[in-house]
């Protein structure tokens, strides 16, 4: 029996592309160095002199603001329920009546590509502008704030990182999105998500058995 491995669209880098940076002989890996390499390699948010747009590779130090106590975050439109959600709702109510948590009358996340794309577009139009300064913020009364909440869709393949990056960069450059918000979002996808995947491939077993 023969087998064939295909490249995964769920990540920007394939395993062999990661191997150059994540050499097993290295003792430490630095996310910022990896991220800068990725920006240069893919010519993302850099000028003709191969320098970062905005003058810095990362605006992370400017993106740690506390969410103002009286600020009202942008409203979020959740996906409409469908037959699949109704079936899951009824099944959970019947078989897990004493479960922790609370069922709500609508899905929290998209469950198909079309609704996932709408979710991405909603983030870009309503929450992207102030994503940067509040990307690390939390609030006791609100769940989403200016976050994209795209991880579930990326992890199950409803959206690909290439699609998310291409769409968000194009939107950001054409709609006056502040550079700290645009760069901060790119860093989450191209920097942290890809870096952690590389760490898993290079040192996953070691990290799990420390």
Can you describe what each PLM-predicted range is?
Residues 1-109:
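Beta-rich, aromatic/charged-enriched effector core domains that present basic-aromatic interfaces
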Residues 61-210:
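Catalytic cores of enzymes that engage adenine nucleotides and/or redox cofactors via long glycine-rich
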């Amino acid at each position: 029996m023969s087998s064939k491995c295909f490249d995964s669209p769920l990540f920007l880098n394939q395993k062999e592309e990661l191997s150059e940076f994540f050499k097993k002989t290295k003792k430490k890996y630095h996310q910022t160095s990896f991220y800068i390499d990725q920006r240069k390699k893919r010519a993302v948010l850099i000028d003709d002199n191969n320098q970062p747009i905005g003058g810095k590779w990362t605006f992370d130090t400017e993106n740690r603001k506390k969410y103002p106590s009286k600020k009202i975050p942008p409203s979020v439109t959740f996906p409409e329920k469908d037959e699949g959600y109704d079936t899951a709702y009824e099944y959970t109510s019947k078989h897990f009546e004493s479960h922790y948590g609370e069922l709500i009358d609508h899905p929290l996340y998209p469950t198909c590509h079309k609704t996932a794309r709408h979710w991405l577009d909603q983030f870009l139009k309503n929450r992207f502008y102030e994503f940067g300064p509040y990307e690390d913020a939390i609030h006791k009364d609100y769940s989403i704030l200016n976050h994209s909440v795209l991880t579930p869709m990326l992890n199950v393949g409803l959206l690909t990182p290439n699609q998310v990056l291409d769409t968000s960069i194009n939107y950001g450059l054409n709609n006056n999105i502040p550079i700290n918000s645009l760069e901060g979002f790119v860093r989450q996808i191209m920097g942290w998500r890809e870096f952690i995947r590389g760490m898993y491939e290079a040192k996953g077993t070691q990290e799990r058995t420390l």
